[in-house]
A protein has these predicted regions:
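Conserved two-metal-ion catalytic palm core of "right-hand" nucleic acid polymerases
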Residues: 1-231, 257
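Conserved polymerase palm-domain catalytic core
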Residues: 181-298, 302-309
């Protein structure tokens, strides 16, 4: 089902993901702790869990916690600017700051992160196969997709990036809209409008139907990894429930409309689930509105619409 090579491959992917993360220093610290002592014995323990579904998972699950990270901070300088006062100063500090918005970052033992990464490799790759070409953010890399379908548990993943390069896809998303607008103006002589918008509080307004994902696994997943995929999906659902239980005392205050929703910030799987959650929205935009250009990068959306001269 799961071998040492597969676990180490998932760990290397996670380690690479942590390296390029800009704000998740908790994950970076967990990576350092995990491989500092008895690395192979810890890997063996994860393999044994997949072989027997033992009680280790419950111990790991109970260690899931949440760190509150400031997302938006205001000071009296910001208030004065919004009030219409022209206030120029090279003093960038204030005596008091007010935290206006926070993010709830999941923290967990490395074993939990590895299970999450394995879900991304095997289940996430299957979901990503059906995403629209209009989706640019957090797409699974071709090497990871290939690995998930090879069913060779003796091999390790050579490439270590779960997702395609951020900067490449971001540039394609942004430039695609601009280039399409130029093309419509020059070729068709029509006026165009470029609309840019973002989805507010996106991750906290997502509800994941894991039963629906189970049904997709049953219908579309390769037979050789179907049982593994269902097992991973079951465990990820429990991890999501634990995360929501942890944030529930706070989220009713900060995001009252999202008390029963939300996916963990800090999991690789959450990036994939966010794309899956909007898959029908992406298809409806293309089929029902059919703008000259539609592109979505996570929660940032670009439309290009033309108007007949």
């Amino acid at each position: 089902m799961i071998t040492k090579n597969i676990v180490i491959s998932a760990y290397n992917c996670l380690k690479s993901y942590a390296y390029y993360e800009n704000f998740n220093f908790f994950l970076k610290a967990e990576v350092a702790r995990f491989e500092s002592t008895k690395f192979l014995s810890k890997v063996k323990r994860i393999v044994e869990f997949f072989e027997s579904d033992n009680t280790d998972f419950r111990k790991w699950l109970d260690k899931i916690d949440v760190e509150l990270l400031p997302k938006k901070i205001d000071s009296h300088l910001d208030f004065e600017q919004r009030s219409g006062a022209l206030f120029l100063s090279n003093n960038k500090t204030a005596d008091d700051y007010k935290v206006c918005a926070v993010n709830y970052l999941i923290t967990a033992p490395m074993e939990i992160y590895i299970i999450d990464t394995l879900w991304s490799i095997f289940v996430g790759s299957m979901l990503d196969d059906n995403f629209s070409e209009s989706v640019y953010g957090n797409r699974i890399s071709k090497s990871i997709k290939k690995y998930s379908k090879e069913n060779d548990d003796s091999k390790k993943i050579k490439a270590k990036n779960i997702f395609e390069r951020y900067i490449d896809n971001y540039n394609r998303w942004r430039d695609g809209g601009i280039n399409k607008a130029i093309e419509v103006i020059e070729k068709d002589r029509n006026d165009v409008a470029i609309l840019s918008l973002d989805l507010k509080g996106f991750y906290y307004n997502i509800y994941v139907d894991f039963d629906a994902i189970d049904a997709l696994i049953e219908e579309h997943q390769l037979e050789e990894i179907k049982e593994l995929s269902l097992f991973l999906n079951k465990k990820l659902k429990l991890m999501h429930e634990k995360y929501r239980n942890k944030i529930s005392p706070f989220i009713e205050e900060t995001h009252p409309e999202s008390a029963s929703k939300g996916i963990p910030i800090g999991f690789t799987s959450s990036a994939i689930l966010a794309n899956w959650y909007l898959a029908n929205f992406d298809r409806d935009i293309k089929s029902k509105i059919n703008p000259s250009y539609y592109g979505r990068y996570v929660d940032d959306i670009l439309f290009v619409c033309f108007f007949f001269a």
